[in-house]
């Protein structure tokens, strides 16, 4: 284990977090809020700890998969703990467990909250909550990749550990260039959404916070009714961008570089839009009688389908009161999730495709024992290692999911609440059904259950294995 490089990167994470906290500090200055002092205190703490850790350059720059997983897991834990400090010091969220839950929910782009009155928070705290979504959406480690002193292709080990999906592709010969391309697309799309929201009459502060939540597919709203009080135009803009941010960013790169054939050839993206279209159609028909207007029913169905499948978690209505078939479809979409290589969570459309194709392959082999059949995607054979890791991911996913439901059941809430609470946190959605529906929150859970759900949020965002590897004894051996 190369401890020196891990410590160095964690130091950089703290320094970057100090820079990020300047935004809510400036927000506090603009709105003349005294709670902004808490960000200055936390910035000082980040620098006091971070600067000494980065003063000495790593003597050994070799950085392999094991170091990548450990660095990513520890970085996200440190990022979340430090990020929770302003909430605690300002007394906005005085309970440390609640503050950690809220912060992890932000960075992991989950959007599950323990707050019953969001509007009571100062502007600077609301800005920080939303900004954590934007930071966590693309990944803070991807953001600093170009700053790391790694050579020999070691960047890819770090990027693979943090990026969502069964595999990671380079968009450019150098990983640093890939990171810059991804963040450039991310930034430009965020700015475009802010401008479109401003055109629709949304205040600047609301536009920035909403765009941060949409871009990171997070879902922290700054209103108690989430997005319900905004106009139809604004809700449509948010719907479109939620769906766009759930697309594999490789597709945007192909479009920008005029490789249109490659973009439209992406099987995962085609299925992603197909699933969205079918879900919207069924739910629109199912809820038509509630709204009495086909256009309104379609708009509400599109918003909630886009919100859930991309794991954003915004709401324009209490879908918890919708007919059972609509609620069931939304729960199923929680598990499917967005595309790999997007800012969305869930199992990912690509993994669902690989699992389905694996089942089809096995059925074919049962019928034709001597046949040799390869699993393909986008016309290319999927490496056996990717298929194997996808199968293992699914098995571990089910085990953690079941264990989490069992552990939080000690709080004695109903099964639907417990099931969807785990689904909403593990898949980084935000709202579930019943007590954790769009009009509820997670505040009623015990501190123990909140820690379980916090673990689920981190495990879901980091794709399970980087977090689990911390508990394996062999991980910490020096050689």
Label for each model-derived stretch:
Residues 1-479:
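Membrane-proximal intracellular helices of multi-pass ion channels
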